[in-house]
Every structure is written in structure tokens, then in C-alpha cells.
Amino acid sequence: MKKTLYEKIYDAHIVHEEKNNISILYIDLHLLHEVTSPQAFDSLRMRNRSVRQPKKTFATMDHNVSTESKDINASGSMAKIQMQQLIKNCEEFNIALYDLNNPKQGIVHVIGPEQGLTLPGSTIVCGDSHTSTHGAFGALSFGIGTSEVEHVLVTQTLKQQRFKNMKIKIVGKVKKFITAKDIILFIIGKLGTSSGSGYVIEFCGDVIKKMNMEERMTICNMAIEMGAKSALIAPDETTYLYLKNKRYSPKNKYWDSAIRYWKTLVTDENALFDKEFTFDISDISPQVTWGTSPDQVLSINEKIPDFNSFKDSIKKDLARSACNYMDLKPGSYLKNIKIDKVFIGSCTNSRIEDLRSAATILKNKKISKNIKAIVVPGSGSVKNQAEKEGLDKIFIDAGFEWRLPGCSMCLGMNNDKLSDGERCASTSNRNFEGRQGRGGRTHLVSPIMAAAAIYGHFVDVRNLNSETN
């Protein structure tokens, strides 16, 4: 029987098969952070249970941490309690922890791949919705709830239904200044935020093959915004090169054995998908979200849509509501929208390639006096590499604040927030109402588009000099 990549990984991890396409799957890697794990550990103690596979469980502090200080008190009392609890839990149950004093500490979906924990063909779970990021390596990865966190800690397994298969093939020639973020936002805009519900999406095509691993992670990270359970990209030479000699990657003869297995992790020819889409991205422009959902997105040179242009009454109402919240008028140009803050970071776009691309735009430029801009590396390793390359100096000279690793302004769960009515050009993944702070208005963009917004409004990065002179 011909199988898709998803079916191969799913079938290889079945511990017990039940009725109605539901199975108990073995979990190869369990990632933890300070927000969704405390209750799970409390339940373990109440029931006198232990962690079955501590060596397959790794934790970090990222959601609540201060990006201005390594002091555990810096993010407030609740954050301090959660971080102290994570330290206690990891010590008691013998789990490796990347705490504030660990030079490798960072966002869970950044440090997993860079440490070689994320491996092709593995199953990976975390109490965080953007766990799909790891699918860029050909790993079946998805977010889970706190009760499931407890179940995996105790059994190293999880009951999962078999999801449907979707293939998204991306073809065409990628033009200069068009990034992986633009491509995935464009696709979400075309298909919608519920298009992936009930599916695992496999991304493929020449465009994907030419992407580096950081770009692939951006694609898979944002697939969850289509409603998908997970996303996958088949591993290839680019994957192997990225993983070679990482701390936890297989070594010596085990590396050779791993490569042989990883090369089997491709969808069989003529395997059946439940849905298939092909997108030619040759002519797309830089993308900017205008509303309060990732699918409310336009090319930079377009206007905010007229409500009456939506034939669907629900979409019309959503557009009206979004414009009210975002304080935008139909017919106004995206390029005329004034920005209060710029945020470069998050598990979507805080890796070294993201910072390099943004720094290229910012070199010898200064931010407007009317805006505040911060750049938050995704991990200590990313921060150190950026500083070795002098990227921090470029950001600082441009007027950015160079911060410590963490989730930062992606979510209003730490000190980095928008105030009521503030508008942000953000490289994060969600633009929901209040996502970056109560009353905050979020526009999702690529790192280079965020960098180009330093003049206090959106700019077509392709025409940066001509539009800002």
C-alpha cells in the first residue's frame, strides 16, 4: 500500500490500535515550558506517579521570561512562581532544563531544532500550539493540552486519531524580498484559517526544496493558523546538513543508520491525499495582515477591502469587526497605516537567518522618533551568533533595543506588551484581538517588512529607498 509521509510516521509509532482510526502512539520527544506544565506535575504527585522517560523530556523557560533581565523576579510574581515551579519539577523528576542561567535557553521551538532534539521521523509533542514548527524536519509534531502533558509524562504515549492528508505544493520563482513568511501568509489568505481543520499538511514542491531549514520552520510554524493538526516537510540533504554535529543528533555509526532511515521518509509515488493544492508564488508581493485573523491579509500595495466585496455574510461581518478593532477604514492603503512599535522575534521569525535579513535592511538607517522597536533572538545560541556577526550593533545603531531570548511580544504574557490602541508591525504568528496586549493592534509581516516599517508606517521593502526619501 502506498503511504504518505504522515502515514509512515503515524504507523511506525502505533503501540495499540483501537477502533475508528484511533491509536495509542509512542512519543519520541516531549518538550515542556513553564506555563502549561505545572498542573501536570501537581497531578503526578497527587497520584504518586513518576515520569516514564525523563531523558526524552526537555524543558525551557520562554513564555513568561523577561527579555531585559535574567533576574527571575523581573517578569512579576506569577511568572516567578511558574518558573520556580518548573525548576522544582525538573529537579524532582530528573528532567533537563534550559533555565535562565543556561546559555542555550530560549524559545522551545527554536532550541529543539538547534540542539538536535528534533529529528526526522520522530513524534514530538509540547503544550504549545506552534509545535508544528518541528514538522520542517519531517517530524510528526503537534501541540497538546495540560492533561495530555501529564499522560505523556507518565506513559510516553498518547491516544491520537488518524487525521486526513493534505498536500500543498509550492512552485514558481521566488523573487527578491519575498520570504517564507510572505508565502505562508499568502496561502493562509487564499485557503482560510479553517482550511486545515482535521488535516496534517505536507508542504512540497521546488520552492520548499530550495528553502533553508529556518524558512521551512516558518512555513510549518504558521500551518497551525490554517487550523491544521500538524505540518510536514520531507527531510533531505538540507535537513541532514543542518542536523549534523548538533548536540543531540546521532553520531558516528548511528548517524549513518539514521540517514538510511531518514531517506525513506518521503511520500510514496501515487500515494493518495484527501486534498491537494498547488500555489505558484512567482508574482506575489510582500504580505501584511490588516485584520484580526491571519487570513485577513493583503499585498503591501493593496487597500483595506470594502465590506461589500465579501459575498459571504460571515466574512463580511468579520471584516467589519476587524476594521473596527484595528481602527482602519475600507479603501485606505496599507502603506499609509502608521506604526507605533516594531517587534522582530517569536518562534516564527527569531532565528539567525531572520535576524540577518532584517539587519541587511536596517544597515545605516535610523528608526523614526515616533516608534519603539525591539529585536528578541529566539535563543542564547542565536543571540551569541548574531553578536559574533555584529548584527546586534546594526540593530542598536538603528535604534532597536537588543533583548534577551524569550517569547516576548508574541503574546501578552510577559512585560513586552502593546498598550491599548498601539499598533505593531510584528514577525509573530497571531494577530488576534489582544494577542500582544489588551487593545493592541497587530500586523503580521516578515522580518524584512518589519525592519522596513521603522519609518513609522508600512513600506514596500522592494522600494525602500524611493519610498522613504
UniProtKB/Swiss-Prot annotation:
It comes from the Bacteria. GO terms for molecular function: 3-isopropylmalate dehydratase activity; 4 iron, 4 sulfur cluster binding; metal ion binding. Keywords: 4Fe-4S, Amino-acid biosynthesis, Branched-chain amino acid biosynthesis, Iron, Iron-sulfur, Leucine biosynthesis, Lyase, Metal-binding, Plasmid. Binds 1 [4Fe-4S] cluster per subunit. InterPro entries: 3-IsopropMal_deHydase_lsu (IPR004430), Acnase/IPM_dHydase_lsu_aba_1/3 (IPR015931), Acoase/IPM_deHydtase_lsu_aba (IPR001030), Aconitase_4Fe-4S_BS (IPR018136), Aconitase_4Fe-4S_dom (IPR036008), IPM_dehydratase_rel_enz (IPR050067), IPMI_cat (IPR033941). Pathway: Amino-acid biosynthesis; L-leucine biosynthesis; L-leucine from 3-methyl-2-oxobutanoate: step 2/4. SUPFAM superfamilies: Aconitase iron-sulfur domain (SSF53732). GO terms for biological process: L-leucine biosynthetic process. Gene3D superfamilies: Aconitase, domain 3. [4Fe-4S] cluster binds at C347, C407, C410. NCBIfam families: leuC, PRK05478.1, PRK12466.1. Heterodimer of LeuC and LeuD. This is 3-isopropylmalate dehydratase large subunit. It comes from Buchnera aphidicola subsp. Schizaphis graminum (strain Sg).
